[in-house]
Amino acid sequence: MQPYLDLMRHVLDNGNDKSDRTGTGTRSVFGWQMRFDLSQGFPVMTTKKLHLKSIIHELLWFIQGDTNIKYLQENGVKIWDEWADENGDLGPVYGKQWRRWETPDGRVIDQITQLVNSLKNNPDSRRHIVSAWNPGDVDNMALPPCHCLFQFYVANGKLSCQLYQRSADIFLGVPFNIASYALFTMMLAQVCGYQPGEFVHTFGDAHLYSNHFEQAKLQLSRDTRPLPTMWINPEVKDLFAFRFEDFRLEGYDPHPHIPAPVAV
């Protein structure tokens, strides 16, 4: 996970101090890219422990098109609690845009089903793209999408993913995003008949909140450890049939968790 640590160090040493929506203050850079070869292990932090259960359940929740936190809460995942209304609703966030993008003429587009079909039937297409950034819905979302657009690429029997993230909370959010999209790529590779290739992570505003500086320095002081491997149930061939029990992280030996406050 050296590319992630390099980004964190670069922002601490060279970033611009800015105000932000939450009033916390950030240090940020604009424009950065990291690459992870998924054949070299599952890209999850080893310099601090991550709550993988939350990552898997959130991804399954996205894929099902859900926008209410009930499923997450039932499974002990609290990462969206601060943004939900009294009924648990978040508005037309990721799941809505991925699975039910509404067009001006009244049609509904299931971008994920379209993606699976195009990866299977037209692998060389340059249109394997899913967008969560819908200008017509942004104002009604509890939180506009941070990881807002991704594209897939097939070459030599391998499936790669590039994510564009407009806004990136480096300490708390980015480790989740890396693991989530790496896992999503592996799931799609399995159901579409490919091997996992690369996960390419491209950032707009990549920032450390000012109340995460000391935690970031602690993480940078720790040695990296070998990456674990992710077992995925090979019997599952339908993207929408995956369940939490179909995943198992093997050989994960991280340093202890580092607590940090969430900027809301």
Curated annotation (Swiss-Prot):
Annotated InterPro entries: Thymidate_synth/dCMP_Mease, Thymidate_synth/dCMP_Mease_dom, Thymidate_synth/dCMP_Mease_sf, Thymidylate_synthase, Thymidylate_synthase_AS
Predominant place of localization: cytoplasm
GO CC aspect terms: cytosol
Pathway involvement of the protein, from the record: Pyrimidine metabolism; dTTP biosynthesis
Active site: C146
GO BP term (any one): dTTP biosynthetic process
Localization per Swiss-Prot or TrEMBL: Cytoplasm
Keyword Transferase: yes
HAMAP family: Thymidy_synth_bact
Full protein name: Thymidylate synthase
